[in-house]
Amino acid sequence: SDLADGTDLNLQPTEELAFAGAHLYAYSYLYDKKVAATDKDVKVTFTIDMKDKDGDDISMNLWMKGEPEREVFTALAPMTEGLSRIPGMPYNIKEQPTLTFVARQHGEAWNRPFVAVYEPSTRKEPSAIEAVSFFDAEEAGLKDFAGICVESKNGRTDHIFSLSDSSQTATYRGMKVKADYAVISNEYAGNRTFFLGNGTQLITPDVSIRTSAAANVLLEQKQGKWYILSSAPCTIMIDGKNVQSGVTSKSTLLAVQ
């Protein structure tokens, strides 16, 4: 476990999780526990040693947004019995402890939610993510909002907006969203992605999606052509040109004149 900038977290041995209260018996099964207090963003990599599979180690990469009054723990837990009964698992579950990460927020967590990005990878199929960062909405009164920027190694950058109330508007660097969830990507190799999740508005300087009722809309540019998948009628604006689209049950070519 490191800070997102690569600095060592300097985790220290702890027994703190063992005394979490009589109602949290599961903590008693954790061992090799270590803790660090930090308000910085954290990057964690869980790695399963795959010596018996040509050394193609399996990793789960985790990026978590930092918050004040937060502690992070690493630990080992007993093997996961349920997973051990699933055929075709990539490693022997019963012979491996479960790699464990715990984040604890002191004080009010509603306005300081746990925000994380997970990405699996192997040595032969390495991580596709270059960097993960987090941003706040420009609306000062918007508290229960999470903003994530994911930069991929292929040149794609995704800005992810998450709100608990889809009637609220979140703005960041010319992007405006009114939805529970939204993804806005840059253009890379003639491709681009916009997703509006249970919302009515997604606006960028050159592309926008508007609906009269909350809807799910996926707008994609593939090799220069635009495709749409929408649960409700919507108005699409691309480079100043408006296009009306009805409900589509599968990805449909959008006629942009």
Task: Map each language-model feature to its residues.
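Non-catalytic terminal regions with compositionally biased, polar/charged low complexity
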Residues: 9, 19-21, 37, 99-112, ...
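Trp/Gly-enriched beta-strand surface patches
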Residues: 4-96
